[in-house]
Amino acid sequence: MSRGYGLIFSLKVVFTFLSLPHPPGLQGSLDRLQLEYVDIVFANRSDPNSPMEEIVRAMTYVINQGLALYWGTSRWSAAEIMEAYSMARQFNLIPPVCEQAENHFFQREKVEMQLPELYHKIGVGSVTWSPLACGLITSKYDGRVPDTCKATVKGYQWLKEKVQSEEGKKQQARVMDLLPTARQLGCTVGQLAIAWCLRSEGVSSVLLGVSSAEQLMEHLGSLQVLSQLTPQTVVEIDALLGNKSHSKK
């Protein structure tokens, strides 16, 4: 596969104690992608049975072998990321550069309160995912589950239950409350949600899930919305959501 200009390739691996020091399936994934290396390899969820030192050594090995340029974490706690960084410094290994975290209107605390501290202390950035909360933040549900949405796909029963739960209905109501703000900015609620995620300090990119080129282009329109997200607009969004993260100090 040719590396097009501006493209960044990444892979995600899951560690178990038995798989160390070689992350499982990494070479096979590279072969399927027809790539010799990826830009970033993510360690998905810290395995409590795998010593942190061994995980950091394994990721350092991956980079030294030329299989990846950098490594990051996915769904790790701030404490685990800090431990990995400390291990890297102690043993002259390579530390993680970013954390992949869920972030959207209804999942805020980690990206807004925990990761910025790591960004300032050790330079670990954030790559966030699920900006539309698996489709909840699109106003397409409106209290029901359309036949064509992801919630009807096999394996996504949990999403259907989420949509139909009391909490899910409350979140859908908040999405509908945001429609006037989106219209004022000349965008969709989905574009507003993605731009809102991009505004967070330390967030370098937001991962998008699309099923068509048209959907991708629509989501990319959020870049035009980002410049319109003034502090006052963000305050108004926070007031409508009613769930702004606050320091526990």
From Swiss-Prot:
Binding-site residues for NADP(+), renumbered to this chain: 44, 74-75, 100, 129-134, 140, 150, 209, 211, 215, 218
Keywords: Cytoplasm, Ion channel, Ion transport, NADP, Oxidoreductase, Potassium, Potassium transport, Transport, Voltage-gated channel
EC number of this enzyme: 1.1.1.-
InterPro entries xref list: K_chnl_volt-dep_bsu_KCNAB, K_chnl_volt-dep_bsu_KCNAB-rel, K_chnl_volt-dep_bsu_KCNAB3, NADP_OxRdtase_dom, NADP_OxRdtase_dom_sf
Enzyme class: oxidoreductase
Its job: Regulatory subunit of the voltage-gated potassium (Kv) channels composed of pore-forming and potassium-conducting alpha subunits and of regulatory beta subunit. The beta-3/KCNAB3 subunit may mediate closure of potassium channels. Enhances the expression of Kv2.2/KCNB2 alpha subunit-containing Kv channels but not Kv2.1/KCNB1. May display nicotinamide adenine dinucleotide phosphate (NADPH)-dependent aldoketoreductase activity. The binding of oxidized and reduced NADP(H) cofactors may be required for the regulation of potassium channel activity.
Protein name: Voltage-gated potassium channel subunit beta-3
Species whose genome carries this gene: Mus musculus (Mouse)
Highest classification ranks of the organism: Eukaryota, Metazoa, Chordata, Craniata, Vertebrata
Gene: Kcnab3
